[in-house]
Amino acid sequence: MAAAVEKILGEQYYKDAMEQCHNYNARLCAERSVRLPFLDSQTRVAQSNCYIWMEKRHRGPGSAPGQLYTYPSRRWRKKRRAHPPEDPRLSFPSLKPDPEQMLKKEGVIPPDGSSLEALLRSDPIEKRIMPDSRDDDSLTEFPPLSRSARKRILEPDDFLDDLDDEDYEEDTPKKRGKGKAKGKGIGSARKKLDAAALDDRDKPYACDICGKRYKNRPGLSYHYAHSHLVDEEGAGAEDKEDSQPPTPIMHRPEEQKSKKGPDGIALPNNYCDFCLGDSKINKKTNQSEELVSCSDCGRSGHPSCLQFTAVMMAAVKTYRWQCIECKCCNICGTSENDDQLLFCDDCDRGYHMYCLVPPVAEPPEGSWSCHLCLDLLKDKASIYQNQS
């Protein structure tokens, strides 16, 4: 192919083209070596400085069978970094300066007067302030650097050493060990912060008395009603005897603001949350109907609006009934994992599926009755009615 091109274009033209191509490649490689490391726009690879480019004079005879040439290996070594010269004005002063020289420098003691007279005439120390940073004297430029120092600062290899040594080259084992130790400490602290933030995000409702956190408001309401209600009522009775009124708690959830009766049950609302009727009339059926009230939040509803059966209506009068938003497990007493709650079709109590004995993996199809209703109703429980 090269012979055909040389025959068509001529020998001299071909030699000139090859020389220009060689010069172009040499300039390109030299320019790339100056700005190493760089990101290759074609391969998207960060090219770092290396020694794979060899000259013809570096060739040696092959040492293995079938090997034409060998090139000398070069051991990697870390380059020395050239630091810019320090400004003498940035150096620290001596530990024991002469007090008289410092006073002369600040202008308190004139050079031709006595020290005692100058101290008597001078202003108090509080009135002596530092010179304004905007003065022309404080903005004097740094002294010009020498040619060799400027060359050392502007040398591109010095700036490339940082990237070569730390990002693209192997580091010494000693330095690598220090880096791992630092990273481990920072990572563990960061993991603790992330775990705390994740816990706050998963359980946004916190008790303002003990600080315990819950995933939803019903759990917080149940915790407050069963853990702090008795203590709060006892403290309120003692505070009535004192002359000073108790300090009100400003930031309290809505469920905690509901008024409680003497037995700890929330005062019931006199209207239905579904049809907005009262005990005298149900606006859906236009008939009078007794209201069922939640013992935690006081919300009320008609049995027909709640789709209660006659058995369920009789059962809710025997215990502290809770609405769907305040419902908690009858075994563990918490409202966490409310998606795992299973409700009895005879008494409307709630149970976690994993709290049952034996645990239930999936909710059963049809009606389900708890162990209390099975012992009380026997074969009249809803679970047997559904099977029949």
Swiss-Prot record:
A zinc finger (PHD-type) spans 269-329, 326-376. Belongs to the requiem/DPF family. The lineage of its organism: Eukaryota, Metazoa, Chordata, Craniata, Vertebrata. GO terms for biological process: apoptotic process; nervous system development. Keywords: Apoptosis, Cytoplasm, Metal-binding, Nucleus, Repeat, Transcription, Transcription regulation, Zinc, Zinc-finger. One of its GO terms (molecular function) is zinc ion binding. Residues 60-190, 233-264 are annotated as: Disordered. Pfam families: DPF1-3_N (PF14051), PHD (PF00628). Residues 156-170 have a biased composition (Acidic residues). GO terms for cellular component: cytoplasm; nBAF complex. Its main location: cytoplasm. A zinc finger (C2H2-type) spans 205-228. It is found in: Cytoplasm; Nucleus. SUPFAM superfamilies: beta-beta-alpha zinc fingers (SSF57667), FYVE/PHD zinc finger (SSF57903). The keyword Signal does not apply. Residues 97-107, 123-137, 251-262 have a biased composition (Basic and acidic residues). PROSITE patterns: ZF_PHD_1, ZF_PHD_2, ZINC_FINGER_C2H2_1, ZINC_FINGER_C2H2_2. May be a transcription factor required for the apoptosis response following survival factor withdrawal from myeloid cells. Might also have a role in the development and maturation of lymphoid cells. It comes from Xenopus laevis. InterPro entries: DPF1-3_N, Znf_C2H2_sf, Znf_C2H2_type, Znf_FYVE_PHD, Znf_PHD, Znf_PHD-finger, Znf_RING/FYVE/PHD. This is Zinc finger protein ubi-d4 A.
